[in-house]
Amino acid sequence: MCSSDLERIQLNEDTLWAGGPYNPANPEAKGALPEIRRLLAEGQNQAAQALVQQKFLAVPRTQMPYQTVGDLLITMSGGAVAENYRRELDLDTAVARTELQVGSVRQVREVFASVPDQAILVRLSATGGTLAFTLSFASPQRSTFRTEGGNMLVLSGQNGDSAGIKGALKFECRAVVTATGGQVTADDHQLHVSGASSVTIAVAAATSYRRYDDVSGDPAALTRQSLAALQGKPFDDLRRRAVEEHQRLFRRVALDLGHNAAAEKLPTDERVLQSATTEDPGLAALYFQYGRYLLLGSSRPGTQPANLQGLWNDSLDRKSTRLNSSH
């Protein structure tokens, strides 16, 4: 979601699931197996099925749900009406961009997730004026918020319980702000930026997950390490590295199904609506490339497998994320 005065960046970390390590084996299954076999041999299939349901299935019967870290909120000051508002996602660069005009000030906001640097980068810039905003975290998890060092925002939390399995994962998300011009100040749980011509926000998240039976990791150390590795690197270099890594895979495939020049000039939402009554073969190609973009962003070597939502989820218990083997 994005508006002229609020930028919401929804945050996920692909190892943040509910619950903790557990053994799903039903302790009654072995003892019930001879009776199940006997019933099946005698043709009593329904009775055998009932016994399977009662004593043979995993405990709990459901998988744990994938969960959200929360949101990074950029609340702009001033409240003036925005004009010339434009949002876009460039599939070729994997950069989301927002442009708008607030009075005499033109604002540009860019957001991308960097595979090589394992961070989300946000760049806000202004011409004809300066930027002023408040940066904060929000989360439905059991969490706390604080600031560190005058320019860093920290979200620390614990995952939730599910189906009788206690939450055992700790997680942390950090956002560090670098401003050109102006100043950055902090209160207990927010950062405030004023008078800046441009601002870079680097976001890193981690959990205590190490493997399926080990959640003893140190998410605080991991996030500090990720952000420390970015120090001193110009934003343009970080952007270039992220784009090159994305294009290394994305540009391996091209698909041309034909074109409708008039349809291709429309905003994507209008183009989708019009496609029901208008021949637009290029829209199918766009969907194809969008799917590739999503998969490149949610499944890489060393990551968790993508679930039915890739890795994007703003809920604590969205049922479709339980089907994590579907991809």
Task: Show which residues each predicted segment covers.
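Aromatic-residue-lined binding/catalytic grooves and analogous aromatic/hydrophobic interfacial grooves
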Residues: 2-322
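Short "domain-exit" segments at the C-terminal end of structured domains
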Residues: 323-327
